[in-house]
Structure formats: C-alpha cells, structure tokens
Amino acid sequence: MAIGYPNGKKYAASQEELPQQKRKAPVTYGKRGMSLEDDLNDTIAYYLTHEIAVIHKKPTPVQIVSVDYPKRSSAKIKEAYFKTPSTTDYNGVYKGKYVDFEAKETQNTTSFPLSNFHDHQMTHMANVLKQDGIVFVIIAFQKLGETHFIPFEKFYPFWERMQSGGRKSVTIAEIQDVSDQIPYGLNPRLDFLQSIDKLYF
C-alpha cells in the first residue's frame, strides 16, 4: 500500500528509515570449526569416560628460561622455548596392548608432505613396533574432509623412499591404498579404535 501526503505527493522513506538487509556470510564446509587435535582429544576423552581405552595426549615440552616474581604468591614466565618433542603425540593402552601414534593434518588436497614428521619420531615409532606395540599415523586432509588411519609398517616405506632421495610427499592415492578411512561421528568423533579392531584384533 502506498502512503501519500495530504497535498498528493507520495511518501519516500530515507535510507536511514529503511530496514537494513543482513548480508549472509558465504557457507564454507572446510574445517567445520574443529581441528584434528580437538577431534582426537574429544574422542580419547570419550574412550576414557566409557572405560574403552586409556589414551593420553602428551604435553609439549617447554624449556623455561626466565621467570619474574612480582609477588611472593605468583610467578610470571618471561621467556620460554618449545623443546623438540622426542616422541609421538599420543600413547596409551587398549585391550592390553600399548598404543602409540602421531596425528597430522594438511590443507593440501593431492598429497601429504613428509616434512611434517621428524627423524626422532620415526625412530621412536620403529622402536615401539619392534616391541610389538600398536603404532600408527592419523592423517587428516582438512579440505577433503578425509581422515586416514595408516599402520606404521605401511607408512614407514614412504619415509624410507624420501630418505633415499625419492618423493618428499605421499600422494592421496598412495595413502588411500594403505589406510583405513576413519568416519566422522558424534560420539566418539573419530572412532579410530574401529580401525585398530579391524587391523590388529
């Protein structure tokens, strides 16, 4: 319905009086608000609460260099550095077996760069494997929405190939050939124990 003035002119609202249309942000399906580490931490908390497995994330070692004591009851760290971690991110026990694994994520869609791993991590995982532990790598391709469970014995040949002058990355096709894809769920978020049951028990 048009509104008019008594003199016959039509009413036109100013820009300030018009309701502002809200601009909707474009919908993105990448990341979905959680990182691989968050997903794994939620998953292992679920396992612990339901007495399924005891797995913990190891804290990142920090070297404290300088501390200030402004009060007797408090301390303020003024300078600290990350130490190079000597082992993997996660370890624990499941069905009486020692479990040890490293988790990495990438934004790449075609390959995973092996530079994300370090020599000392590979040495540690190889040593755990020699002691008959369950050792594996979880790699998440965030943009693809895929998370892969790779037994260490199938992942290590890619590392050896790089060490002998070969490719410095693993293609997504190579990973899909040797891995078990972990489906996303509600609880637990990333049920990697399904992969352990399938491959080791």
Curated annotation (Swiss-Prot):
NCBIfam families listed in its UniProt record: PRK02234.1-3, PRK02234.1-5, recU
Name of the protein in its database record: Holliday junction resolvase RecU
Cofactor binding mode and count: Binds 1 Mg(2+) ion per subunit.
Under catalytic activity, the entry for this protein gives:
Endonucleolytic cleavage at a junction such as a reciprocal single-stranded crossover between two homologous DNA duplexes (Holliday junction)
* GO function term, MF aspect, one: magnesium ion binding
Per the record, where is site Transition state stabilizer?
104
According to its UniProt entry, the function of this protein is described as: Endonuclease that resolves Holliday junction intermediates in genetic recombination. Cleaves mobile four-strand junctions by introducing symmetrical nicks in paired strands. Promotes annealing of linear ssDNA with homologous dsDNA. Required for DNA repair, homologous recombination and chromosome segregation.
Q: Which organism is it from?
A: Listeria monocytogenes serotype 4a (strain HCC23)
Check the record and name the CDD domains matching this protein. Answer: RecU-like
What the entry lists under SUPFAM superfamilies is as follows: Restriction endonuclease-like
Q: Which residue ranges does the record annotate as region Disordered?
A: 1-26
Any one Gene Ontology biological process term? Answer: chromosome segregation
Compartment annotation: Cytoplasm
Give the InterPro entries listed for this entry.
Answer: Resolv_RecU, Restrct_endonuc-II-like, tRNA_endonuc-like_dom_sf
Give a GO cellular-component term: cytoplasm
Q: What gene is this protein a product of?
A: recU
Swiss-Prot/TrEMBL keywords: Cytoplasm, DNA damage, DNA recombination, DNA repair, Endonuclease, Hydrolase, Magnesium, Metal-binding, Nuclease
Determine the domain of life of the protein's source: Bacteria
Q: Which cofactor does it need?
A: Mg(2+)
State a single Pfam family of this protein: RecU
Q: Where does Mg(2+) bind?
A: 87, 89, 102, 121
**EC number(s) stated in the UniProt entry for this protein:** 3.1.21.10
State the organism's lineage: Bacteria, Bacillati, Bacillota, Bacilli, Bacillales
Family classification: Belongs to the RecU family.
The protein's predominant localisation is cytoplasm
Q: What's its top-level EC category?
A: hydrolase
